[in-house]
UniProtKB/Swiss-Prot annotation:
An individual GO BP term: protein ubiquitination
GO molecular function: inositol hexakisphosphate binding; protein-macromolecule adaptor activity; ubiquitin protein ligase binding
Pathway: Protein modification; protein ubiquitination
SMART domains found in the cross-reference section: CULLIN, Cullin_Nedd8
Protein name (Swiss-Prot/TrEMBL): Cullin-1
Encoding gene per record: cul1
Coiled-coil segments: none
Pfam families: Cullin, Cullin_Nedd8
Length: 767
């Protein structure tokens, strides 16, 4: 049957009844047909006759009533009698429906009966509401406007009547039946749920504001149904979860919990009001997850150790649903990163030599693999969670700065990182393809960000860069520039300013050399020559204490360049770094083969070999006297020559003895024409490392003192504790200072009269 729109001015002619009883008797047949025999249908003519009868009754009565004389008495004339007769009919009709519902003792049958009658009743109520539309528009509206008596529109009247005569009598059994059906559903028992949605919708529809139907009001639904439903849910899952955990693994339980939560969401979508979703899930999550958090958390470490990725992802998803579920996971993850990282680093420490002989490449690759695996876990399993990222940062900073390699010295990580960077940026690197250099540099910066003693890295990196530039062994200018840019991005311009100046010196040196080659004195001895003029303020290089005597073959070139430079730069002084200089010597020493070899040597080595143009044999004492080399340097050089069989040690002689003899090997043979003899001497490397660490300590003291002076100059007076804290805050981007070192620097500044102690724990700045 279709709802019709009527026009009050175009109604059919219908017999007018002189009395209320006559009108109601006619209307009642139609009302009862709509409520009780709706499936039989009703003709449009019949429907319009009923509508017209209501209109005529109200219209005739309203002829003597105006807005000015409308009151409770006149309202009765206008339409209240019809309204009251409808109320009585609904009471009688709904009493019969109530008996039908109560007579059903089976859970599903009662729900089916209730759902059937409710659906039929609400459909009929909509037609009745339209049928009494004139009464709604005039009498109900005026009644509510001009009297204190609340009158419902016809549809609301039907709902209120249902609530009073049906629902309020069977609500308890209806609730229990609904809860029973939901429990069966959760137990996966065969359940016909088609009536459940209708019954719940009935409860929702009956939860209205009787004073204003336009206002949303779910108070009855919430207090009567939702509260009991959620409590029933909690009881169900409390029992099930405890029993399931007792007989299944944590992995199985997590899967079960996810399935159950998804099922509860589906229950709401299919059968309940959408507002129930949030409190239902919160209650279910509390029972399934929060109340078992400790047991679940205890298994998380195992999942991480065994790399159970699916379990880890599922654990994170579930724990993220509870208020404090993720905090223990973050702590466990942090400990896992440290524990696994420490164990991985320990495996690469050589049994002989210990942490002192750790290979930089192997060490850095181990740290990187640990970081990348952990970062991948954060991105995939923890969805890039910022708190888990912080836990990773905390753990990895601990790993980088306090692993077994760093036990003796916290500066080992930055030192090894600088050496690894050097291996990537040097031409001799054979392990990294040129296309992968940029990726390697980015990986270095990843580790660098976690290094606490960035000043240590700076010192070692600067020294190694100096070697690459001096020896011409940089892999590429682009790679060097890229590395500087990355360091500047992390630490700022000041950190890389000296490094930038070193590259400028190399460019200027090329210009100086090219200009020198235009002069006649540059061709002295017909020797190819180039010089690097390096500023002492920027380069970590200094003359050694060796009184080296330059070979006579090189003296004219040496003097010619020095005179040229002084003529261009008056007032400057050149300090020659012969220990860093190198060259090539053509040698034809085997008369049988007559092969010309090219020896790549240091200037010190050159000073020794060129002597053999004059004699075939020298004693150790003679070599030392002629070259001016110290015992350590000369012994190291001769050892290299003896191993390469360029020189031969006299019979029964011992290396380093004053009278031991060293003869040129006229039978020297080598497959390669170019022979690299300029090899690092281990004692030099060890001494260099010690000197670097010494320089770092001295630089730190100066840095601390300058920071303290800056702070005190700005603050004038400070307590000891505050000064220490502010000093640490200023310096921590470069390294983590010890409190004892800060105190020592304060004492030094007091001695220098920059500061004065006032009382026991306060300092005054002295201008």
């Amino acid at each position: 049957m279709t709802t019709l729109n009527t026009n009050d001015k175009d109604l059919p002619i219908v017999k007018k009844y002189d009395s209320l009883n006559g009108t109601w008797d006619f209307l009642k047949t139609g009302v009862s047909q709509i409520f009780e025999r709706l499936d039989e249908g009703m003709t449009i003519t019949k429907y319009m006759e009923l509508y017209t009868a209501i209109h005529n009754y109200c219209a005739d009565a309203s002829k003597t009533i105006t807005v000015d004389n409308f009151n409770d008495q006149t309202a009765n004339v206008l339409g209240e009698a019809l309204y009251n007769n409808l109320v009585l009919y609904l009471e009688e009709y709904l009493a019969r429906l109530r008996k039908e519902c109560i007579s059903q003792t089976n859970h599903e049958e009662q729900l089916a009966a209730y759902a059937k009658y409710w659906t039929r009743f609400t459909t009929s109520a909509r037609f009745i509401n339209h049928l009494f539309g004139y009464l709604n528009r005039y009498w109900v509206k005026l009644k509510n406007r001009f009297t204190e008596t609340l009158v419902y529109d016809i549809y609301t009247l039907c709902l209120v009547s249902w609530h009073h005569h049906v629902f309020s009598h069977i609500r308890d059994s209806l609730l229990q039946n609904l809860l029973y059906m939901f429990t069966k559903k959760r137990l996966y028992e065969p359940t016909d749920m088609k009536y459940v949605e209708v019954c719940v919708d009935s409860i929702t529809s009956l939860s209205f504001d009787k004073t204003d139907m336009t206002k949303p009001n779910l108070s009855s639904y919430k207090t009567f149904f939702e509260t009991n439903f959620i409590e029933n849910t909690k009881n169900f899952y409390a029992k099930e979860s405890s029993e399931y955990l007792a007989s299944h693994s944590i992995t199985d339980y997590l899967k079960k919990a996810e399935i159950r939560l998804a099922e509860e969401e589906e229950l709401v979508r299919l059968y309940l009001h959408e507002s129930t979703l949030k409190p239902l899930l919160e209650a279910t999550e509390d029972v399934l997850i929060a109340q078992h958090e400790e047991v679940l958390h205890n298994d998380f470490a195992r999942m991480l150790d065994q790399n159970c990725s699916e379990d880890i992802i599922r654990m994170y998803r579930l724990m993220s649903r509870t208020p404090n579920g993720l905090q223990p996971l973050r702590q466990t993850f942090e400990e896992f990163v440290k524990r696994s990282g420490f164990a991985a680093v320990a495996k690469i420490v050589p049994q002989v030599g210990g942490e002192a002989d750790v290979d930089p490449k192997e060490y850095m690759e181990m740290l990187l693999s640990t970081y990348k695996a952990s970062k991948e876990l954060v991105n995939t399993a923890f969805h890039g969670d910022t708190d888990f990222t912080k836990s990773l940062d905390t753990a990895f900073r601990e790993l980088v700065n306090r692993n077994v390699v760093c036990q003796r010295s916290s500066s080992r990580s930055p030192e090894l990182l600088a050496k690894y960077a050097d291996s990537i940026l040097r031409k001799s690197n054979k392990n990294v393809d040129i296309d992968d250099v940029e990726d390697c540099l980015s990986s270095i910066i990843i580790i660098f960000r976690y290094v606490e003693d960035k000043d240590v890295f700076q010192n070692f990196y600067t020294k190694l860069l100096a070697k690459r530039l001096v020896n011409g062994t940089s892999n590429s200018q682009d790679a060097e520039s890229s590395m500087l840019s990355k360091l500047k991005e992390v630490c700022g311009f000041e950190y890389t300013s000296k490094l930038q100046r070193m590259f400028q010196d190399i460019s200027l040196s090329q210009e100086i050399t090219e200009a020198f080659w235009q002069l006649p004195q540059s061709r002295a001895g017909n020797i190819d020559f180039s010089a690097l003029v390096l500023g002492t303020s920027f380069w970590p290089l200094s003359p050694n204490n060796v009184n080296f005597h330059l070979p006579e073959e090189l003296v004219p070139l040496y003097e010619g360049f020095q005179n040229y430079y002084y003529s261009c730069h008056n007032g400057r002084k050149l300090s020659w770094l012969f220990h860093l200089s190198k060259g090539e010597i053509k040698a034809r020493i085997n008369p049988q083969t007559n092969v010309t070899y090219v020896f790549q040597v240091s200037t010190y080595q050159m000073g020794v070999l060129l002597l053999y143009n004059h004699r075939d044999s020298y004693t150790y004492e003679e070599l030392a006297k002629i070259t001016g080399l110290s015992t350590d340097f000369l012994t190291g050089i001769l050892n290299i020559f003896l191993k390469a069989k360029v020189l031969l040690l006299g019979d029964n002689d011992k290396l380093g003895d004053p009278n031991s003899t060293y003869k040129i090997n006229e039978n020297f043979r080598m497959k390669k024409i170019r022979v690299q003899l300029n090899l690092p001497i281990r004692s030099e490397q060890k001494q260099e490392s010690l000197e670097t660490h010494k320089t770092i300590e001295e630089d730190r003291k100066l840095l601390l003192q300058s920071a303290i002076v800056r702070i005190m100059k700005a603050r004038r007076t400070l307590k000891h504790v505050v000064l220490v804290k502010e000093t640490i805050d200023q310096i921590k981007s470069r390294f983590t200072p010890k409190v004892s070192d800060i105190k020592q620097c304060i004492d030094m500044l007091i001695e220098k009269e920059y500061l004065e102690r006032q009382g026991r724990d306060e300092y005054i700045y002295l201008a």
